[in-house]
């Protein structure tokens, strides 16, 4: 997306240019009558409805796409609509005319005023998230020209085009038209611009031609990308794609809602028996109670209101380490309280040392930045920070993609001490110079292994290289995750001081033992039938179903609804409003089944999730561990069922056997046979004998038990079993 006029967004009184559209019939030789006011209201609607007159504020013609030169159809059929695309060669040639906005007879877009902003509702006239077109009307049109999603037109992969108004859609081929039941931006049926349902090879809106929306890069004249695909589970930079107008509703402000907390399960007390490994020199001793942390009274009151009475192992070790000012890499099982482990000591320091940011400062300079890979997770961290800082002078702010940039800026300028952000939106805000980095004392990477891999690693390196960002010697850097592969540990050295401490709680990279794991051998074409069978036996118990692709998430959710199983879906192609609505429906029981991609695999803490079903196994074992960690949290028990396809999942056999064995789960004989008949370089045949699945890559460790705090010097580390 181009540069946004955030000053106009912040000032709602600034006037915005609103383009005026003409009637839907062609009136002008070159279609250059975009701003002429109609003589009467009836002028917009007169004349019979024709296929050539596609819609108001729509495309130039229902036949303008699918040709190499869209102008050919216009010149031949002499028809156009006002407010959409003019004549010329703007589309149908795999891109834009000159890849920029132009005016004149051959303009691909109308020209916009420079003071246009996201707050203007007319900004809905533009491209939808996956390449479709919006005309500012959220309601669907009736009749054969019905629009799907939220006004988007596209083919199989988000391009332009609509099925023929005269063709009947085959329900077996097209479960959803364009967005369908779940409002997703992913249709199934491809179609060219002239109504044909067959694929085109050049200028059509189908999968094999034309503009494919978010999945296709558009190269501008300067050689830079105007649009770029976003990674699943993450977000794209706000400098790309259309402007976003969504403003999320504020969270409830009443004290009961702020301090609503997760109920611990019957196995919570078993945490005391988990072994803890601390690596590094001069590690401070662990604490046993919150009182030993010497926190201020307000913070202790908030801890009590939140229902925290007992420390988890990761909290016992991490809190004193952070209070001592040491850099930390902490690895603990899913659902073990890692968020509180870093928030509490950071807040304690800030309240003791005083804060610098306030709403009276023009440039906000937060003391702490917390970065997480997904929007849902970063919002969850913000709610925890707001809870623990309740009644204090510390103000937490959350910013993430999919929401209006102006809204994010307005939240920051009101005062920001702790900034919770996703990488893309954070870099946009820094680029707008709305925050300063000179006062940063704490940098936290949650789900750090994901933040440092190829998905977000470059953005994180850019962050620590930003002007004003204190060097790693002048700030405290904290990393938390349930999995820390060795290569990620090596990358982390660029962010951490050389004397950082490594805390490994229990089975590093291992699954939570409170989750009962079952692996079923199910072929690809038998999965749907098996899924329905399991869900019918489960009943209304809350269940998450994981699939590998966004398209399949919507397809499976639609299929389950047809089977009378209330289901919703969440994935990276859904608008943020839709993602939040889906999570809300699942969280509050309206839809007991949530079909998700990896966007929901990490960090999400949804109470009372009893089942996780891996409809598709992930590509890595680490992702498997994170997925099944959505259940069995805080000492509660859960169940995970995975469908193992012999044709596509053999590469996971050995690491899966190891995870099952380490978590003391039953291993099917057929899975062991596959595992030990498959050679994976670097993988040891033994699945037992090493207490920790992966260890600190440095030397000098002490293994401790959280119950007795006995320590013993561990021998020099041996080569790990590489199973990630």
Curated annotation (Swiss-Prot):
Subcellular compartments: Cytoplasm; Cytoplasm, Perinuclear region
Domain Helicase ATP-binding: 319-502
Subunit (UniProt): Found in a mRNP complex, at least composed of TDRD1, TDRD6, TDRD7 and DDX4. Interacts with RANBP9. Interacts with RANBP10. Interacts with PIWIL2 and MAEL. Interacts with BMAL1 and CLOCK. Interacts with Tex19.1 and, probably, Tex19.2. Interacts with RBM46.
Protein name as it appears in the record: Probable ATP-dependent RNA helicase DDX4
Gene that encodes the chain: DDX4
Region of interest (Interaction with RANBP9), residue spans: 228-247
One example of a Gene Ontology biological process annotation: male meiotic nuclear division
Leader sequence residues: none
The species this protein was found in: Homo sapiens
Biased composition (Low complexity): 195-205
Tissue distribution of the protein: Expressed only in ovary and testis. Expressed in migratory primordial germ cells in the region of the gonadal ridge in both sexes.
Gly residues: compositionally biased ranges: 150-162
Main location: cytoplasm
Residue numbers carrying Phosphoserine: 222, 226, 722
Coiled coil regions, renumbered to chain: none
Motif Q motif: positions: 288-316
Biased composition (Polar residues): 30-42, 704-715
Domain Helicase C-terminal: 530-675
UniProt-annotated binding residues for ATP: 332-339
Entry-linked SMART domains: DEXDc (SM00487), HELICc (SM00490)
Amino acid composition bias (Basic and acidic residues), ranges on this chain: 69-78
A Pfam family recorded for this sequence: DEAD
GO cellular component: cytoplasm; nucleus; P granule; perinuclear region of cytoplasm; pi-body; piP-body
